[in-house]
Amino acid sequence: MPMFVVNTNVPRASVPDGFLSELTQQLVQAMGKPAQYIAVHVVPDQLMAFGGSSEPCALCSLHSIGKIGGAQNRSYSKLLCGLLAERLRISPDRIYINYYDMNAANVGWNGSTFA
């Protein structure tokens, strides 16, 4: 059930076609989870500042049942910051990513939970 959310001040017109699919496929490879369970949500055009500047920035979160931890998170940070830099032109030092290891009983899907 990985869910990756990107809140950014980058305009919608600057989000390339296929970006959501690319994020999904990269997360499939990085996390070893099936694409059918991965959700990606990009929220452009946000009123945001990072370090007092309104230059392009992003505040992100990655939620998952398992596959969250120190070494894994460093790997995800490298991958995701790289994609955001390349595709949205956001400098990696203007990106925060929060990681959440979810309890399966606290994640609802398809009329039930993952527990």
Curated annotation (Swiss-Prot):
The active site is at 2 (proton acceptor). GO terms for cellular component: cell surface; cytosol; extracellular space; nucleoplasm; plasma membrane. GO terms for molecular function: chemoattractant activity; cytokine activity; cytokine receptor binding; dopachrome isomerase activity; identical protein binding; phenylpyruvate tautomerase activity; protease binding. Keywords: Acetylation, Cytokine, Cytoplasm, Immunity, Inflammatory response, Innate immunity, Isomerase, Secreted. It catalyses: 3-phenylpyruvate = enol-phenylpyruvate; L-dopachrome = 5,6-dihydroxyindole-2-carboxylate. Homotrimer. Interacts with CXCR2 extracellular domain. Interacts with the CD74 extracellular domain, USO1, COPS5 and BNIPL. Belongs to the MIF family. This is Macrophage migration inhibitory factor. It comes from Sus scrofa. The gene is MIF.
